[in-house]
Amino acid sequence: MSIKTQSFAASNIGRVRKSNQDSGYAGYNFFFVADGMGGHAGGDIASALIAQGVAKADRVYDNTDAAAESVVEALLEANSKLAETVENHPELKGMGTTFSGIIVTGDLVTLTHIGDSRVFMVSDDQVKQVTKDHTFVQRLVDTGRITPAEALVHPRRSVLMRSEEHTSELQSLRHIS
């Protein structure tokens, strides 16, 4: 059995921000969001560079291992371009982006995630979050120092511990059905 998809991508600046630092992609087999880090120079550039570099991984794969390898390879390549851009434009130092994407292979989904852009699985009448935020506050929850309810209003809830900036640490989850 294959997974059938319908997709679209849209983004809205909202009422608070002055610029939109999001990039997204809704393709045939690959769907992702890259959310540029607000408050840092070049969040919009970081998300666009990652999105342009990673979108090329949208193709049919024989298996989920090949899909995961291709996505991670594309992310690492795009991350190198991001680092090169910072080297050539020092004013962009500190720019980064989150990345959360799924690629469909037959009846399986491969998920790659870094940062705090969430992925949810929707089936029948259930919605389940399948990613865990890579934030300072999530780490506090994980270690039992604060409750999930306290995390919702914590003043540092948006402080990322991992992003596409200077890292090759990717949480690549495979075989999600």
Description of each model-found segment:
Residues 1-168, 172:
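PP2C/PPM-type serine/threonine phosphatase catalytic domain
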